[in-house]
Structures are given as C-alpha cells and as structure tokens.
Design a protein with these regions (language model features):
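Short active-site oxyanion
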Residues: 14-20, 157-158
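Short, solvent-exposed mixed-charge patches
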Residues: 178-179
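General beta-strand structural signal in soluble alpha/beta enzymes
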Residues: 22-23, 162
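Metallo-beta-lactamase
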Residues: 1-5, 16, 25-175
Length: 179
C-alpha cells in the first residue's frame, strides 16, 4: 500500500538488501520515492550513508511485483520451507463487477494483503481495523471489498491483523455483516 503511513523506512530496508514486494502499478512510484534527489527527514539516511552510489550503479532495485487485473488475482508466495506467506492483490471487487456506485477512490486498486494460511492470520492495510469495543462498526465499502476478496480467494482467516490498531477475530469481522 503506497500511502505515506505505510512506506516509511523503505530506504532503510533497501539499504539492508531487503526485497520490496508491491503491486506492479506501484513500482515506478517506489523507484521515484526511493531515489528522488530531494531532501530527506533523516539526512543522511541509511541508504545515503552506506550505499550512496546505489542508483548510479545500474543495479536494479530489488522490487518484485504482484499483478492483478480486473477479475483476475495476483498471488506472490514467500516461504522459508516451513511457513508460507501468500500475498494477494486486493481487487475492488464490487466496482470491477459493475456496480459503479461502490468505487472507493482507488483505495484498493493497487493494494496487497498478506495471508499466513497455517496460522489463519490475514494482514490488511486500511480495509478493516477491528474495534476493541463491543459496538459493531458500520459496514464500509472497504470492509465489503475485503470480505469479497476473502470469499473469492477461499481464504480461511482466524485473525485479522490490521496495519493500524489491534488484531481481532474473523468471527468479529463476519458479525459486522450479520454472518
């Protein structure tokens, strides 16, 4: 997810050799923010300090992409031989299936979600944040999008781990829809 509150520290991770995984529509944007010559909050940051010639070295940035077009699903798998992490493109499903009223400002058009199938943990950015109160939140288009993606991909989450807030159960998520 390319919003500012999710990409902080990318240059630090890149300087340490981390591969960045994103939706393929984000790749050029990430290259721009990683190598833009403008001032940085941390100056010098780790990339400038330890790899100052990275960009002109002609080494390709270690950015791998997940694609996903309308009515198709991109998937990227990372494993250490024991655990499996599946990364999926989040489709703006209701919009892509023809309901123009459900367009949510491109919020999930280039978004990914991660799933640990062995643990039943689903990580999403900004689509759903479990509440810590007993009051159920109102259903949002983002929640509908997440729920439709879970169904289409046949995922079986037990726990939702949001990018903001505390984890919550999938049962709590389903109760929002009256399921």
């Amino acid at each position: 997810h390319h919003h500012f509150d999710h990409v902080g520290g990318l240059r630090t991770y890149l300087s340490q050799g981390t591969t960045i995984v994103t939706h393929d529509s984000n790749k050029e944007y990430y290259l721009d923010i990683l190598f833009h010559p403008g001032p940085r909050t941390l100056n010098p940051d780790r990339l400038a300090k330890y790899n100052p010639m990275y960009w002109i070295s002609r080494r390709p940035a270690p950015i791998e992409t997940v694609s996903g077009e309308a009515r198709g699903t991109g998937k990227y798998v990372i494993t250490d031989g024991v655990k499996i992490l599946e990364i999926y493109h989040v489709q703006d499903m209701n919009y892509e299936l023809g309901d123009q009223s459900l367009r949510y400002g491109h919020h999930s058009e280039d978004m990914l979600m991660a799933y640990l199938p062995q643990d039943g943990i689903l990580f999403n950015a900004d689509l759903y944040t479990p509440t810590q109160s007993s009051a159920l939140p109102k259903v949002t288009i983002s929640m509908v999008t997440l729920n439709e993606n879970i169904k289409k991909l046949k995922l079986s989450p037990v726990t939702h781990a949001p990018s903001h807030g505390q984890p919550g159960s999938h049962a709590q998520f389903l109760s929002i829809f009256g399921d």
